[in-house]
Amino acid sequence: MTEMTTPLSPRELDLMNAYWRAANYLSVGQIYLMDNPLLKEPLSKEHIKPRLLGHWGTTPGLNFLYVHLNRIIRNRDLDIIYIAGPGHGGPALVANVWLEGTYSEYYPDVSFDEAGMKRLFRQFSFPGGIPSHVAPATPGSIHEGGELGYALSHAYGAVFDNPDLVAACVIGDGEAETGPLATAWHSNKFLNPKRDGAVLPVLHLNGYKIANPTVLARISHEELEQLMIGYGYKPYFVEGDDPATMHQMMAATMDRCFDEIAEIQRRARVDGVTERPMWPMIVFRSPKGWTGPKVVDGKPAEGSWRSHQVPFSTVRDNPEHMALLETWLKSYRAEELFTADGVLLPELQELAPRGKKRMGDIPHANGGLLLKELRMPDFREYGIDVPKPGSVEAEAPKPMARFLRDIMKMNEKAANFRVFGPDETASNRLGELFEETDRTWMAGMLPTDDHLSRDGRVMEILSEHTCQGWLEGYLLTGRHGFFSCYEAFIHIIDSMFNQHAKWLKVTGAEIPWRRPIASLNYFLTSHVWRQDHNGFSHQDPGFIDHVVNKKSSVIRVYLPPDANSLLSVTNHCLRSRNYINVIVAGKQPAWQWLDMESAVRHCTSGIGIWEWASNDANEGEPDVVMACAGDVPTLETLAAVKILRKLAPELKIRVVNVVDLMTLQPKEEHPHGLADRDFDDMFTTDKPIIFAYHGYPWLIHRLTYRRTNHHNLHVRGYKEEGTTTTPFDMVVMNELDRFHLVADVANRVESLRPQAAYIKQYVRDRLIEHKEYITKYGEDMPEVRDWRWED
């Protein structure tokens, strides 16, 4: 090797290799041992866990990178956050955070000595202990890595608007085969070195997944190099299996990469260079299960898929495996690494950074510590003047867009708010954001482009996965964000939502040192009832059903019926912490029902009787309760009420509108739930309830099944009927229209029985006219198009 490739002195090389051995020893101990952590006595059955869980294969590589990043931090005084894409290598991160002293500060019972080491080993993947992955309980983690694909987008999200932060992102070669990860490579086209930090991707090629080779490990060097160049990176290769050689190569490569990062940032921040740079990245090829047993039961282990999880698992009852484990553990020579009391030797402790520079204690990984309140204008100032219900038409998102625009403006200096979306910001009627900012764009630009800028704060890439990953990384490191998306296509990130909801559940309820972060706010529009022009593929309101499966401590669902209520809900969501808020509202021109103060009162309650639409106030109990949730169901309900007033003026109708869907659940099930007495007072205990709902109707039954009057509840909603047709035909196809609602009342209100036949005939006639009209003219009937609440 030349001098340029050997930056480590013999002494430093020995120390770094020893530190790596210590991390590997602790990792194996976590997987296998529950006692005898320093092997002071011969290994026996009582020392071995009864159930061996964990993943060894990726772990030594993660440990190797950690010690090298520690060297970079010490030498350059950098802030680096470690993101482990192969989060199943949980033992590695736990081991390193313990070695640097952070773990014992967060968990004093896991002390920095032999007793603490024993507890460290015993607790791993053990009942009452810690999970097997880089879970929220791991200091320094913002990425559990259980579900693969999101490491790189999380890394970029973390460094946006964090100019002094570097995210070292380890990408497993299995993870690199996922769709989200493949797209996330393009995040470098959105990273501005002047105002953002940097990401150092490390593609860890250990060759195998659970039982198969990985694609990127089996293509040629040239093909892989060209792939990374094509993504816009400058790849460096560190490949081999000899530890001493690999340490020198990795140290030299990391020095070069961090030199290049510093130069890229200097040129952007000092020289004013604006073109997109080629950011460095590392391809790190090492054996799977490196330093582990080479052969188990006559079959290859190290460098094979067989080392992916536990290389051998019958230790307690297999003397050969017991001896193999003991030999493996002793190969790390723990007596050279720890004192007799289990304390890491002082010269090895010196390799770790100090204080908040430690990757396990970096404040960015506990974003709530850094979170600052958004500066926000009074949302009431953006409201629509509604003199009377149904007297004004408007596109609900537009006032919200002006509100978001000014939030962007007021927080320009703090640089802690961004809006995310898959190429839909303008389509979703949020275009007024562009009066204040632009779309972030570091790739090539043409004179004809619209609102592209190196300094934009609207993040658009046609990948819901990448948008979600960016936003999660941004929130987890202490900032605020807003995600707008077509309702049907938010399903693309169903699983990412799952993982973030799980993270919030654990951090909020089980880990007191994790400070609350800003909520993840979804605005879903272009929704099912106004996707008549795009057709069946764009018609799906089921994300709500998916969301409500999660813990009530985490999720909130809002269905504001008009623009002023949308403003009120948005204001509330942006101020909230540790939630996932889902807001669903249409973007097409629609009637406005509530003045601003009425909207605020209604949204604060989450549910309420609309007295102006009801006629039962002084008449005792109503004959029927007509409930609605969602803007189009609200419109159809009010249209049905107007028809019923004409056909059955004596009918006492109570109109209930639901903004906060979780109010329907009992108070014991959700903190927003109505008490049973309040629910019964509003919905009665024995009168028919006709409920027009935005989504799949059975969700309402599920939320209300414990309520007294559930047996009288009849729900209309989306029944998976759709095509390219007219807006009103969409609700007719799903029997959510005003005419079907009128028929439902006629069928269920006993006092209407004498005239029910006439009412239902009226309904049938109108539905026939509707179908004939749209077939002939291609648009809805004038009485539908021109309908208004006002007389």
Swiss-Prot record:
Any one Gene Ontology molecular-function term assigned to this protein's record: aldehyde-lyase activity
Protein keywords: Lyase, Thiamine pyrophosphate
Keyword Cytoplasm in annotation: no
One of the GO BP terms on file: carbohydrate metabolic process
Entry EC number(s): 4.1.2.-
Gene3D superfamilies referenced in this protein's UniProt entry, alphabetically: 3.40.50.920, 3.40.50.970
Listed HAMAP family: Phosphoketolase (MF_01403)
Name of this chain's protein: Probable phosphoketolase
Organism in which the protein naturally occurs: Chlorobaculum tepidum (strain ATCC 49652 / DSM 12025 / NBRC 103806 / TLS)
Lineage of producing organism: Bacteria, Pseudomonadati, Chlorobiota, Chlorobiia, Chlorobiales
